[in-house]
């Protein structure tokens, strides 16, 4: 193979890897805003540096979970359990036993579809304590693989396996799962195969729900607009709290004092000793908090 072809293929791999990592970060952000987990890092941290870290010595970052409220309110299909009728009572009872988890899982699947766009749902058979039924598990982040003529139906999927990382003594490396219609492989982050099983279903046991028809990409956009609104409100309300604090206490200033003896903010029962000609005062910043609240409501 010529150097030109090698460079082209490597550049394509690099671009695809960057897109995959960017998509994973985006899904993590959507999930974090839905669960209200560490959302402060998106307004003051490496993900989004809108505030100096010293600002949060004055007030804590505002954390409004608008995303969860909106997604849960929007997801109303499974508010009431559907009526599934196969034509006779005996068949209905047997079918109901097979779908023991379905109504509960579908409610969550609908919410995650509205949130992340196109989750992968693993349909699996479960036998536990005499109960035999279908089970449904959501995979939020994954990489799907397609044959060239068909960009709509994946033939294989790879995703990271959830691990008990909160356990103090858990030190195992990250594991991944590979599925196609013939095999299921578990491998670690170094590519070492740990387990391999034949696929008992004979088909890829995943479905990919979406709230809109596929347009230019297999992976749906998700509720990035809702999360962006949530982020803007968190920034706005944090600014408001900082403004209120400075309006209440003001910003102290001094002139005619020695540089090596700065004046610190002190209590109302303390005296401040100023040199001859020294001046001290407190300024309140401008701004109208009521207008900020009106913007937030709008």
What do the PLM-derived regions correspond to, one by one?
Residues 4-8, 31-34, 43, 51, ...:
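Extended hydrophobic/Leu-rich segments
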Residues 106-216:
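Extended, regular secondary-structure scaffolds
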